[in-house]
Amino acid sequence: MSDSLYDIAVIGAGPSGAYFAYLAAKQGHRVLLCDRAEFPREKTCGGGLSRKTVGLLDFDISDVIERKIRGAWLTYKNRDTVVKDLGARSGVAVLRSRFDALIVDRAHGAGAEFRQSCAFQSARRTGDLVEITTSGGLVTARYLIAADGVFSQVRTHFFGTGVVAYAPAVEAWIYVPPAILDAFEDRVLFDFGGMPRGYGWIFPKKDHLNVGVFSIYTTQEINDHLRGFIALYPGLAKRTDIKYRGYAIPLRNRKGVYQDGNLWLLGDAAGFAESFYGEGIYFGLKSATIAAEAMGEAFDRPRDMAYTRLLRRDMLTDLHYSGLNARLFFSFQKLGFYKMVRNPFVNRQFAELIVGGVGHRECFYRTLSTLPYWLTSSRSLPAAEPAF
């Protein structure tokens, strides 16, 4: 039994699962990390990492950075554009295939065992242990960590369906000449009229643009909205070498269940993504750090709810207020752009969300308490037409 017994089995080697495996292995635990895919694998995602996201990692990721981002073009249907620069505080653009593989390599280097092409099939509890059946055989562990995405099979197996609400997102990879990439001047673009009750984005990478749309309000016409967004930009609309990809972004955990004793949900599997920007990697990594702290506190008490307690202390409030910020802004989308995005004070609050200067709760109350000021103010960030 000792040779096949792991302290922790992690299903899913995306950022949350792999980073938790890395942290848990550093604590001295015997960790098994499994993923159904063969690595490196393509992963549909905008690939923008905010500064606060990068700051959660305790190792360097320079080798997988496609482009450093210093700011953003902010526009409404490709009109009335303004620029917000944050310098080195903004973030980076990565390809998920390389970024995820880097974290897996770090986890393996810290002592975690990694099994790829190893799919979860079923699991059952036997006392304080969990027996997990995978396509690679039977595994026994003291803890089972579900980090297998928004459509988590582990979560469904133990908690049933309907736990996580999600919204569709779609993106396109558009290969453009270097001159167009250079014209972005290491900025991303957010178009707050590019998607009804949502936004469109353009992220420059090394050799292509990642272009997509997102809304917290689910829509069946999202592919049409992406094509409409691309049509707003003549330099993109005439391109023919476009690859389309769809995926889902979790919005919330409907049932508020993140743990059942020694079964824990991380990242997308737990419904962790903020609602305004649709950013999931930050909260995925944050949940991994919280889980590692909880494991350090309560490893010998498998029925302890330490993980849930720490989530409530450190993260769930921020997620709740991200939903309030999104509904406040996107319910009045055009007004939101012209009175909030273009207003220097309000813009600063939402920009600080990206770098970690404020949380969503503070941003919400600062914005709401100053509503009469920015609603009647004529102040605006300076206009700046992009060169693409």
Locations of the language-model features?
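Beta1/beta-strand and adjacent pyrophosphate-binding region of the FAD-binding site
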Residues: 2-14
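Conserved hydrophobic helix-helix packing surfaces used for dimerization/oligomerization
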Residues: 8-10, 31, 263
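N-terminal Rossmann-fold NAD(P) dinucleotide-binding loop
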Residues: 17-18
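Glycine-rich FAD pyrophosphate-binding loop
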Residues: 23-44
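A conserved beta-strand/loop capping segment in the N-terminal third of enzymes
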Residues: 50-102
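Predominantly flavin-linked oxidoreductase catalytic cores and closely associated redox partners
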Residues: 106-237
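FAD/FMN-dependent oxidoreductases across multiple families
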Residues: 120-122, 138, 217-295, 299
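C-terminal helical "tail/cap" subdomain of flavin- and related membrane-associated enzymes
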Residues: 293-388
